[in-house]
Amino acid sequence: MQTQLTEEMRQNARALEADSILRACVHCGFCTATCPTYQLLGDELDGPRGRIYLIKQVLEGNEVTLKTQEHLDRCLTCRNCETTCPSGVRYHNLLDIGRDIVEQKVKRPLPERILREGLRQVVPRPAVFRALTQVGLVLRPFLPEQVRAKLPAETVKAKPRPPLRHKRRVLMLEGCAQPTLSPNTNAATARVLDRLGISVMPANEAGCCGAVDYHLNAQEKGLARARNNIDAWWPAIEAGAEAILQTASGCGAFVKEYGQMLKNDALYADKARQVSELAVDLVELLREEPLEKLAIRGDKKLAFHCPCTLQHAQKLNGEVEKVLLRLGFTLTDVPDSHLCCGSAGTYALTHPDLARQLRDNKMNALESGKPEMIVTANIGCQTHLASAGRTSVRHWIEIVEQALEKE
């Protein structure tokens, strides 16, 4: 796809990068077939190809309006289109650039600005998020439905973590929302890894991965959080930590992008590249281990929801399922498993109606095989699916750790 950049855009390094990405697109339209928002809305501008045209028009100096912003905002960034694209278009990078340029040219309505700023001030701060969640649980009957639905109906308390006692050690990103919404997930991870001879090291100075800010178009703040994490992890990396582990695939997908996002930062480019190379999802670590040592015989019938950030962003589709099958669990078939559940980070709060439709469609698919429980690999998906109030939804490692206790 050829573009005629304006003089302003020719002076913009990110616009030049966008132009380079656009050149790979042959506007074949394969991407529209797997786009969740296009399937729901049937509007070309709510599919990847249409959004690519909108970004092209922005780069060429056409008028940028709230409608332009609305169509770009409606994208889930699920990256299903990237899995489908035969030309290898880096759509998510293009979208980030397009959104950033549009954000500078269009002033959002006040309610949108308040919501987005509120999310940015709360979600990345675990203590604030925990306190407000506790208040929300008390006030649940009086809250709007879309907020009420996001509060956990139940949480499993974190079990004790084992001491640092093994030579093999990994860092683990604790996350922002997960310690409050699913506090046992990281503890269960540490306990399973301990049985395999791997200790999880704390990195207390590390914080939010940066995805919340970045995807709400506060991209510089997102990059600042990335730099903070690199600094927090670096001493442990130099001391020989073999991996940086993520139990939330949304965080993992973003940390794996640090190298790309900071490639032009003279101070952080090399460190960011090394961090991205060390970043692994939990399943990447476990699949290489002798799981038979755990002596688990899974006795549950599960439906696994593979998050978009795991299957499309990290290209790990089918890997959790293989691990669960190795451990003896029974898995049901899930129709249209490539489609997004509608969580998409903060999307379920910024676009509640679309998110709810996608959630209900996904729950119908997950429940079609009549599982005892639904398991997933990302806290956003877990919370969003659970908000339907139907089949119980947990992180898959918790179910593995439960089975471990029975042995």
UniProtKB/Swiss-Prot annotation:
Pfam families, per the entry: CCG, Fer4_8
Cofactor: [4Fe-4S] cluster
Cofactor-binding details, from the entry: Binds 2 [4Fe-4S] clusters.
Binding annotation for [4Fe-4S] cluster 1: 25, 28, 31, 85
pH-dependence annotation: Optimum pH is 8.0-8.8.
Function per UniProt: Component of a complex that catalyzes the oxidation of glycolate to glyoxylate. Is required for E.coli to grow on glycolate as a sole source of carbon. Is also able to oxidize D-lactate ((R)-lactate) with a similar rate. Does not link directly to O(2), and 2,6-dichloroindophenol (DCIP) and phenazine methosulfate (PMS) can act as artificial electron acceptors in vitro, but the physiological molecule that functions as a primary electron acceptor during glycolate oxidation is unknown.
Quaternary structure, from the entry: The glycolate oxidase likely consists of three subunits, GlcD, GlcE and GlcF.
PANTHER family named among the record's database cross-references: GLYCOLATE OXIDASE IRON-SULFUR SUBUNIT
Protein's UniProt name: Glycolate oxidase iron-sulfur subunit
Species of origin: Escherichia coli (strain K12)
